[in-house]
Amino acid sequence: MIYDWVFAVHEHVAFTAFDTETTGLKAEEDRIIEIGAVTFDRKGIIARFSTLIFPDRAIPPDVSKINHITDDMLVNKPRFCEIVSDFSRFIKGTVLVAHNANFDVEFLNAELSLCKKQPLSHKVVDTYAMAQAVFPGLGRHQYRLQNLALQFGLTVHAAHRAEDDARVCMELFTTMIAHHAKQNGHCVNHAQSPTIKKLIQEIQASSTDCSQELF
């Protein structure tokens, strides 16, 4: 399975489930307007992170209809470059978890580039792809975050808001970990292999370098 390494390390490292809300769908053109994240390990939640972000542009009306974030809500909010150091410290030493992760990672890297910072170097788990592997055979639309939440009895308080979507993503991830353990047994012994030990060390040392400028 594509994420066998996750099942091998999950009892030994921390994870950060995160989500972004944006002004549109193109990372090269649009901007992040909200980040929500929750760091957790096998014992439970460690910390939460949430902030609205001023994007230096108006939010298209069709986007506001989806995430219910308005221009007025972003007045006097920090720009991404003002929160990047805090967010980088928050995710340091963790595996990142996101639903349709390429979207969020592309936006974060685009914002990091605008701030003249290094791109993300963390291991990333895409719960969309993970769900397809753990629960094969569902209809294509059933792998959407809210549909998976409904199927597995996870509570959704505010769909398309970053903080709640991050929490739901975390709960979906832990549901899949538990399902895999029940079906296949825990993978604790695998963590003793040299390869997995090295991976654990790399994860725990992972960070986004916000002290070094790219150009």
UniProtKB/Swiss-Prot annotation:
Positions that bind a divalent metal cation 1: D19, E21, D165
Active-site residues, record numbering mapped to chain: H160 (proton acceptor)
UniProt binding sites for substrate: D19, E21, D62, N67, D165
Transmembrane segments: none
This protein's record includes keyword Metal-binding: yes
GO molecular function: 3'-5' exonuclease activity; DNA binding; DNA-directed DNA polymerase activity; metal ion binding
Cofactor(s) listed: Mg(2+); Mn(2+)
Cofactor, how bound (note): Binds 2 divalent metal cations. Magnesium or manganese.
Purpose of the protein: DNA polymerase III is a complex, multichain enzyme responsible for most of the replicative synthesis in bacteria. The epsilon subunit contain the editing function and is a proofreading 3'-5' exonuclease.
The name this protein goes by in its record: DNA polymerase III subunit epsilon
Organism in which the protein naturally occurs: Treponema pallidum (strain Nichols)
Encoding gene, per UniProt annotation: dnaQ
